[in-house]
Amino acid sequence: LKEVGVDAQILSSDMLRKVITPKPKYTEDERDIVYGALVFIAELLTKNGVNVIIDATANRRRYRDEARRRLPKFIEAYIRCPLEICIERESKRIGETYHAPRNIYKKAFTGESKTVPGIGSPYEEPLNPEVIVDSDKLSPDECAEKILKAIKRHFY
């Protein structure tokens, strides 16, 4: 977006969760609080002219539906990826670049965690996202370009 002159604030669910719940349990109640806070912050920012990108799994449709209801200029970008590719990518995360928890799939498969979306916790696929990006088939640049085209199509 910066390359085309559009500034945006990224709201990361993982970063916000660390502030709200320093020792997260990933319960349904905790997720309700975190996703509710994300939408609330996005709503405040957009009312003040700030473009917002919400970076979140939002494993329940109700979280995405609430964002769509409360944010007037909203598009849902579904970044689709097969589970085996997610597992491979997560295993290669290094450094502090990623704010997401580590070894989530390993913990899910060993029974240490029962809250990983799509494994121990439900993941409800979007029904009508404005754009679908198959991140296992496209490069990161191609994914970004497809999302940018959807943004332009809806707002410019």
Q: Where do the PLM segments sit?
A:
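Small-molecule kinase domains that catalyze NTP-dependent phosphoryl transfer to phosphate-bearing small molecules
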Residues: K92-K146, F155
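Loop/turn-to-beta-strand initiation segments
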Residues: N48-V52, I75
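Conserved phosphate-donor/acceptor-positioning beta-strand/loop module used by diverse small-molecule
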Residues: R70-E90, V133
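Short catalytic-loop micro-motif centered on adjacent basic/acidic residues
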Residues: V52-D55, I132-D134
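Short, hinge-like loop/turn segments at secondary-structure boundaries
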Residues: Y26-E30, R70-P72, R93-Y98
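Conserved nucleotide-binding/hydrolysis micro-motifs of P-loop NTPases
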Residues: M15-R17, A58-R60, R80-C86, L138-S139
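Conserved substrate/cofactor phosphate-moiety recognition/catalytic segment
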Residues: L1-K47
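Conserved catalytic network of the ASCE P-loop NTPase/AAA+ motor domain
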Residues: E43-K47, R68-P72, Y123-E125
